[in-house]
Amino acid sequence: LKLAYRDKYLRENPNDFLEKIESRDIHKEFLTQDELKTLASTPCDIPVLRNASLFSCLTGLRISDILNLKWENLCTAPDLGHCIRLRTQKTQTEALLPISYEAYALCGEPGTGKVFKELRRCMTGYPLKAWIKKAGIQKHITFHCFRHTYATLQIAAGTDIFTVSKMLTHKNVATTQIYAELVSEKKRETVDKISLK
């Protein structure tokens, strides 16, 4: 509509008659670095759920991308080390994302087909809640919260918002800005700064 108005197809800009929608405060739950370490050291009844969850915390990948992640998507780039090359399910964005050795190790022994073969979406419900509870974490954590964890811990560790935005494959840095607002202090730098040990 804005273009139609600008190109003189419309006499008036319809947007001038709309009321601005106020943005709501959206609370995004995430794990702190200590909670992440606690979760990583807590036994999980479903090993593939543990590995995929921690992988998401270390990479920021969505559950849809983890469920579809294949060994052929993992590669090594000369300047980046271990990487994931994929087209994201949600935004269809092509990306080459560096990952830490720790994240790569969670994938297990290289093979063919899907990386997390036994992972099912239903595991991200009750089994995930049971593992979180077993770890003593008193927050409402869903699988998507691991993506929030990645973003928040990266920003807290000092990674610039543009880099975090690219790692999350956000099309707009403003989307990533939400995480910056969750963080009150900056600490260190890039990929290896989020650790399970």
What residues fall within each predicted segment?
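DNA/chromatin major-groove-contacting recognition/catalytic segments
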Residues: 38, 95-98, 105, 109, ...
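Basic, Lys/Arg- and aromatic-enriched nucleic-acid-binding interface segment
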Residues: 6, 10-63, 67
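Catalytic-site neighborhood detector that most strongly recognizes the C-terminal catalytic loop/helix
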Residues: 30, 88-92, 168-193
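Active-site/catalytic core of tyrosine-dependent DNA strand-transfer enzymes
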Residues: 98-138
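Conserved tyrosine-mediated DNA breakage-rejoining catalytic core shared by Y-recombinases
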Residues: 17-35, 68-107
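Residue-level signal for the short linker/turn that defines the boundary of a DNA-recognition helix
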Residues: 50, 61, 141, 158-159
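Short, polar N-cap/turn motifs at the start of nucleic acid-interacting alpha helices
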Residues: 73-80, 138-139, 159-178, 189
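C-terminal catalytic core of tyrosine-transesterase DNA break-rejoin enzymes
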Residues: 54, 58, 65, 147-171, ...
